[in-house]
């Protein structure tokens, strides 16, 4: 096989001339494939005398090994070049300053909710929640709000149909809790509520927090003491506080609570009262044995008063310049 050395030399030259993996694979097929030059050389061994075939076969195998080694070396070199090129393209300039990590912050209304939950949690109140799409029984009837009450008017409430609505207060959760639990009950209920109103101090959706205690021998004195402690803790000062007689269908007696502002004027902050006996009867609690008090407050309003915000709508506009002030 005098031309075998020449064939190997051509193969090695073709290997070195391959500029990528695809071209290199074509060289492999040309010389070592099923119909490649070296494969044909092995096939031609049958034409030799039997005694010459082993030696000739060994020479061809040696040639195949040389070509395969050349292929492997070239492939490794090409793959290394591809990797180096990719790394060069992805090079990071370690001398550049790092990107600043912007820390997020809680929304001011969320801060208010968490602050209130922490205070009442230390007094043994649990946090309850309920559906925002409510039925008229839990939102009105069970709370001593009859069908003719103005709060049920279409212009104040978002109704889906004759019995389904977006809840106007979180009081429905109080009803559900009293239906499911026996006294003593001590809960707060934060959540979104909906009313058909929109101006500088009202939005169609806002956050409310209600509280409820039902137990033996609960009095208005307990209510006043609890709310005095809460308001002074929340505003972090010894505020002047007053209770004004008011009316709510679900409490009797009822009151609204004001705090003295820095401008010397009274500011309303929440409503409260002793749970109406009819409400207790509606959930199967005997008002002759148990009594309770309830209170409710708007989270946005308390947040406005705490941080000096003048327009309620600012809480819902997602302006980072505004929100970053509360980090």
Curated annotation (Swiss-Prot):
Predominant place of localization: cytoplasm
Catalysis: reaction(s): tRNA(Phe) + L-phenylalanine + ATP = L-phenylalanyl-tRNA(Phe) + AMP + diphosphate + H(+)
Cofactor(s) needed by this chain: Mg(2+)
Domain of life per record: Bacteria
GO cellular component, one term: cytoplasm
This protein's record includes keyword Zinc: no
Upper classification of the organism: Bacteria, Pseudomonadati, Pseudomonadota, Gammaproteobacteria, Enterobacterales
Family from the record: Belongs to the class-II aminoacyl-tRNA synthetase family. Phe-tRNA synthetase alpha subunit type 1 subfamily.
Enzyme class: ligase
Name of the gene encoding the protein in the UniProt record: pheS
GO MF assignments: ATP binding; magnesium ion binding; phenylalanine-tRNA ligase activity; tRNA binding
EC code(s) of this entry: 6.1.1.20
Protein's UniProt name: Phenylalanine--tRNA ligase alpha subunit
């Amino acid at each position: 096989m005098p031309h075998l050395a020449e064939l190997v030399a051509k193969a090695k030259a073709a290997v070195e001339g391959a500029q990528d993996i695809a071209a290199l694979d074509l060289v492999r097929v040309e010389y070592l494939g099923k119909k490649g030059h070296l494969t044909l050389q092995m096939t031609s061994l049958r034409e030799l005398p039997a005694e010459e075939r082993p030696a000739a076969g060994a020479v061809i195998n040696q040639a195949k090994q040389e070509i395969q080694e050349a292929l492997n070396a070239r492939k490794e070199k090409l793959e290394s070049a591809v990797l180096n090129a990719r790394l060069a393209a992805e090079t990071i300039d370690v001398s550049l300053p790092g990107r600043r990590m912007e820390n997020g912050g809680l929304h001011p209304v969320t801060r208010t909710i968490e602050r209130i939950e922490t205070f009442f949690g230390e007094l043994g109140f649990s946090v309850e929640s309920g559906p925002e799409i409510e039925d008229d029984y839990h939102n009105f009837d069970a709370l001593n709000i009859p069908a003719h009450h103005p709060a049920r008017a279409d212009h104040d409430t978002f109704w889906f149909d004759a019995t389904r609505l977006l809840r106007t207060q979180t009081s429905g959760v109080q009803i559900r809790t009293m239906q499911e639990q026996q006294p003593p009950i001590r809960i707060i209920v934060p959540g979104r509520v909906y009313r058909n109103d929109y101006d500088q101090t009202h939005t169609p959706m806002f956050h409310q927090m209600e509280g409820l205690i039902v137990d033996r021998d609960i009095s208005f004195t307990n209510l006043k003491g609890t709310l005095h402690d809460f308001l002074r803790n929340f505003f972090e000062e010894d505020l002047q506080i007053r209770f004004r007689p008011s009316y709510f269908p679900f409490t009797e007696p009822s009151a609204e609570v004001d705090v003295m502002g820095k401008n010397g004027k009274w500011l309303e902050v929440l409503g409260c009262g002793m749970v109406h006996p009819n409400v207790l009867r509606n959930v199967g609690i005997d008002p002759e044995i148990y009594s309770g008090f309830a209170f409710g407050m708007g989270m946005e309003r308390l947040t406005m008063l705490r941080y000096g915000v003048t327009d309620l709508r600012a809480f819902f506009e997602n302006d980072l310049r505004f929100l970053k002030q509360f980090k």
